[in-house]
From Swiss-Prot:
EC number from the UniProt entry: 1.23.1.-
GO biological process, alphabetically ordered: lignan biosynthetic process
Entry protein name: Phenylcoumaran benzylic ether reductase TP7
Positions bound to NADP(+): G11, G12, T13, G14, Y15, I16, G17, R36, K45, R137
Functional description taken from the UniProt entry: Oxidoreductase involved in lignan biosynthesis. Catalyzes the NADPH-dependent reduction of phenylcoumaran benzylic ethers. Converts dehydrodiconiferyl alcohol (DDC) to isodihydrodehydrodiconiferyl alcohol (IDDDC), and dihydrodehydrodiconiferyl alcohol (DDDC) to tetrahydrodehydrodiconiferyl alcohol (TDDC).
Pfam families reported in the protein's UniProt record: NmrA
Tissues with expression: Expressed in flowers. Expressed at low levels in stems.
Family label: Belongs to the NmrA-type oxidoreductase family. Isoflavone reductase subfamily.
Key word Oxidoreductase present: yes
First-tier enzyme category under EC: oxidoreductase
Length: 308
């Protein structure tokens, strides 16, 4: 069997980064995490770094804004995965420049991990946030860097514990607010599974210069189907309040930041159906649960079961 690629994760202590680092280490890839000195003095982040070390991850000290440290780190690996947060997405141009200079990278995964930004019709302010990811994609392609874009749609941990109810901390028990008509399908993926599928793609020629869509059939549900599943689990019918699209668009315009970004993403997801309103063509994409049927993914039903 071919040797597994050495993987460097940048942004590994962030929300989705932790799961990608863990999946990489557990699957036997020599795994490296680029960590800033300041991260080590953060009590929460330093615990995450300790956990990485226990998994056998090599911690490299460096910074996105220090070109030399970046090139030095990149030269030690074969694959770079960026899991940076929204505020740093545009700065991935620095990463692209370092990858180009290092000249040894077999694959780059930019920070995506949401809906396919080339296929969305999101309104502002989500439109501008997605546009940054689009710019990064075009820059990667222009430089001829081999890539995989991971489109995992909704993080289960963001959406399912509250079922997208404003201000809630638990799933609804009495009434539920449903955006649009509730018939549009969205996709919900558990974060460990996102990490697992991402790492499976690292050495897979089928995912080279393609978008890897994580769209397992059991996790592709409309809002109405989600509510019906939850009602069955708790043995109770909820009062349903449907919010028309006009009202959502008005709320996006009048709410204080950062709410409009969240509302605009939810509008694209649950009203426009931007995660499921196109067919995956072999020319641009592949679907993870089809490529890797051996992965026992967490279904939405399994996930919601913890909250009954």
């Amino acid at each position: 069997m071919a040797e597994k690629s050495k993987v460097l994760i940048i942004g590994g202590t962030g929300y989705i980064g932790k799961f990608v680092v863990e999946a990489s280490a557990k699957s036997g890839h020599p795994t490296f995490a680029l960590v800033r000195e300041s991260t080590l003095s953060d009590p929460v982040k330093s615990k995450i770094v300790e956990n990485f070390k226990n998994l056998g991850v090599t911690i490299l000290h460096g910074d996105l804004y220090d070109h030399e440290s970046l090139v030095k780190a990149i030269k030690q690996v074969d694959v770079v995965i960026s899991t940076m947060g929204m505020m740093q997405l545009g700065d991935q141009v620095k990463l692209i420049a370092a990858i180009k200079e290092a000249g040894n990278i077999k694959r780059f995964f930019p920070s995506e991990f949401g809906m396919d930004v080339d296929k969305t019709n999101a309104v502002e302010p989500a439109k501008s946030a997605f546009a940054v990811k689009v710019q990064i994609r075009r820059a990667i392609e222009a430089e001829g860097i081999p890539y995989t874009y991971v489109s995992c749609n909704c993080f289960a941990g963001y959406f399912l514990p509250t079922m997208v109810q404003p201000g809630a901390t638990v799933p609804p028990r009495d009434k539920v607010i449903i955006p649009g008509d509730g018939n549009v399908k969205a996709v919900f993926n558990e974060e460990h599974d996102i990490g697992t599928y991402t790492i499976k793609a690292v050495d897979d020629p089928r995912t080279l210069n393609k978008t890897l869509y994580i769209k397992p059939p059991k996790n592709t549900l409309s809002f109405n189907e989600l509510v019906a599943m939850w009602e069955k689990m708790i043995g109770k019918t909820l009062e349903k309040i449907y919010i028309p699209e006009e009202q959502i668009l008005k709320d996006i315009e009048t709410s204080p930041m950062p709410l409009p970004v969240i509302l605009a993403i939810n509008h694209a997801t649950f009203v426009k159906g931007d995660q499921t309103n196109f067919k995956i063509e072999p020319s641009f994409g592949v679907e993870a649960s089809e490529l890797y049927p051996d992965v026992k993914y967490t279904t939405v039903e399994d996930y919601l079961g913890h909250f009954v």
